[in-house]
């Protein structure tokens, strides 16, 4: 059976990188994209100069300013970021049509059957990185492997502006040395659980008795054990029919209570509106949609039919309902709208 050739591309602090590209004076100072320190604004991203001070995405602007008083926070320009994303995807399509976007600045590419560079995934990744730097003016990191999990970990391995290639022969050795925090779904609380079991790297997880893992992680245990062995059969999925429009964020530190969850909701809703900007979705909006993933990996989703003008208050109410179902620390929040086919839903629902 032929090994797949998967590339994971991830731009380095994307929004901030675009701003630094357009204003080189920003390159050497700590800066971030977000709202003002007054109120409940949070950051979308921060450059590496700011991250030295502990500034991170989804952090309240007021907290970031306390960590780094010299931090420059600018509002950002979603249209500019979307254009850069479109330029990146145009480059991707020169090498494959099998592209799975994860966000504006991140995507999986399946180049298994690409004829470019005699089918060399490494050469393709090198060329994509070079072209994006030349044509878009920003750096991206890339991981090349036989599956999505290892490719994504590899793209993080040498950030920023790095390329990590994991050949089939080196795959098990590579994944064995990967800290478990790199596994998707492993947050702070899960790391603490694993640490209590003596698990810090995937090699530790490989050696752990499956029944012990299952007792602590339930239905997640099989996926964790597979990833720890470097096994991931998920295909690169090309979405052909949009059934929803949404944004979500996985937090580097779990949100401990409802108040912290409500504090990050405004930036998610702002990003959602920006994603909808200039796109003719309003006549198709049928339901509000909110997702919460807790620190124990359990997930809850709430939907509510749209019966009047769109209101951010509905998302706040849905968040309260979702949080009340578990009342545990939260590692991910997603907000969005379900879409109906245009011919079935013709309401005009402007934002208020």
Swiss-Prot record:
Keywords: Cytoplasm, DNA damage, DNA repair, DNA replication, DNA-binding, DNA-directed DNA polymerase, Magnesium, Metal-binding, Mutator protein, Nucleotidyltransferase, Transferase. Residues 6-187 form the UmuC domain. InterPro entries: DNA/RNA_pol_sf (IPR043502), DNA_pol_Y-fam_lit_finger_sf (IPR036775), DNA_pol_Y-fam_little_finger (IPR017961), DNA_polymerase-Y (IPR050116), DNApol_IV (IPR022880), IMS_HHH_1 (IPR053848), Rev_trsase/Diguanyl_cyclase (IPR043128), UmuC (IPR001126). Binds 2 magnesium ions per subunit. It is found in: Cytoplasm. It is an enzyme of class 2 (transferase). Its EC number is 2.7.7.7. PROSITE patterns: UMUC (PS50173). It catalyses: DNA(n) + a 2'-deoxyribonucleoside 5'-triphosphate = DNA(n+1) + diphosphate. Mg(2+) binds at residues 10, 105. The keyword Signal does not apply. The active site is at 106. One of its GO terms (cellular component) is cytosol. The record marks 15 as: Substrate discrimination. The keyword rRNA processing does not apply. Belongs to the DNA polymerase type-Y family. This is DNA polymerase IV. The gene is dinB.
